[in-house]
């Protein structure tokens, strides 16, 4: 959108002396222009030009009218004419730059906009456009307001944080929320750019009695403006910021690669300038950009650098030749450590030096760590090499798919980093710590013996171990929580699994984790996360979310990583989505696909679910229902549906079996099952390969070979202690009965008053790899190729089978294909999950 100064001619008077009537006509032209009345605007500018032919102002106005009409070439000529009359007309240079930009003359356009800024430093539209084009504005930032006294808004004191207030230094326990900002349909770097979104989020976060927001990376200027406004208006409920500096992994584990390291250094300096409101950041792929003019530095609690560094990358760096083992910096030092310890200390020190030298400011700093790289030793864990050797020695076959990164091989130890005497703010340890991963948290008998006020807790035992190691230094749990996903990716002894929780269960577990972090004596916790983010992947589902770049367009309830939000993001319009046990009108609004005198099948789809409703038909108390589902008509599948005493003319890859309210599940044709399932007589390591290599949608069968939707969540392991730990998994196809109002994971419900059997199936259960383009799994080809194909639509057959004598009481053959519309922008709505209120009440009680 083109935004012009309120009074261009008043800002940049033309050289020509024109009659008052010409100036009045120009003013009228701009008023008409801003109201969208282009023809009257053009007429007024033309009248002014006739009264004063040599003036630049009327030509500039007409040029902008032409630009808005899409006539960039004519506009360019008018702007050139205006500048010939007055070369100091900043509006003329701005218009010329915009016209040339639309004509594809980017270099000349940038030159014109830089001329604009040189003439009028505060011409923000020109600055913003230059930054949007990824160009340097040419402006040097104003001198930094460097206080003569050191500015230390926060510091570490023993094992806690303190913040400076009007009353002096006060203890500060972190009650935080991690703010990811990728809305449905957006890539992770496509942040909201409007102030109102961030203002609304910050108000909600503060209302939950949180006191801290953490960012992983630099967000757009709108976030910092919203944070500044919130804190200025709510001094007693101010939000502190933990600012991150993101980094991708370096190539081949070389953290000293000049290009990569230089980019990271520039990003650190950029982050410092951003929080002080003194940055002009040009657009770059994958990054926020813009004019950063909001100074929030007085409420930045700490820096946390980097990401969850992958063990394989740290391992590679530690084994590079001539790695440094010590570091003596101005604010941080390492007497003896690994090259990775030294490198991270150096980066932290460089950021501290930059903020001190430019702004005379210090605050606490840490790098991101997580359990796979903790400095503790875990006997139940083994490296890849160790495990394969232990398998051979114990008579077990090697694992052909042992891709798990070498947890507990290398370590990052914050206790090796020592603040120097010049460090006024301190240093701390920051961990992403969840209760369900890695396995050593849940297999260690010592952790299993731990007991918090909540009860037995491996997680609490692990937190106590972390605190013991970091005695005297704050430990911040910078990520924790469980998701409200239907799918489960890892099981945990106390039931705090990686997924498989409805929203009420999620709330109870997150409250428990929050309490245990405090009881363990840590410096605070930052819950993950503010928002459900659809673009994410977890290891169980990632290979079946294809194309990967389209995951953002649909909501996979089987993917735990997409469902951590306190603010839920849900498919469909608010108030219009069918829910088990909900308004029957919504279910009856779905179109009828097949029908008979006895029963009708209605079908619908949205970015989360396939909806099926049986309308009419025999009651479930006397009848079993089996629905055959064919996601790729013309392919393979089974003709014999389970428990149905007739063979279909069509083939099906899935069978929905509704026996009664306590026994319902989705089955998959064995040939099309992407995962290995337990088989009778198989050995303990039979599930090592994880995937069913050779699964295909094209293999036909009449054997009635159906599998459960079992998936291995915890693989078979052998530890350094030579103890073995059995594989574990879940049957994802078991359907949960009930009302969605009572359980967010309800899959189906019988509404006897309405005569409806209501079912919703998450797309991930049906081997749909991208519902937004109707793409389904075609086959899995060894060693690691997952092929997909576009489905023409789904077909369904319905059998109603009498309970007493197995006779088919009603039959709907597969006929019509259900081809739902594809989409490029998902329809969705949001609401706060119960965990929001649960944490609000807990945090408010402390």
Which residues are covered by each model-predicted region?
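Register position in tetratricopeptide repeats
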Residues: 34-35, 68-69, 102, 132-137
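Surface-exposed, glycine/proline- and aromatic-rich loop segments on solvent-exposed faces
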Residues: 592-717, 773-803
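Aromatic-lined substrate-binding rim segments of carbohydrate-active enzymes
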Residues: 194-266, 348, 352-358, 452-453
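Noncatalytic carbohydrate-binding groove/subsite architecture in carbohydrate-active enzymes
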Residues: 272-301, 307-496
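Aromatic-rich peripheral "rim/lid" segments of glycoside hydrolase catalytic domains that contact
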Residues: 490-495, 505, 516-523, 527-591, ...
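Active-site-adjacent substrate/metal-binding segments within catalytic domains
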Residues: 146-232
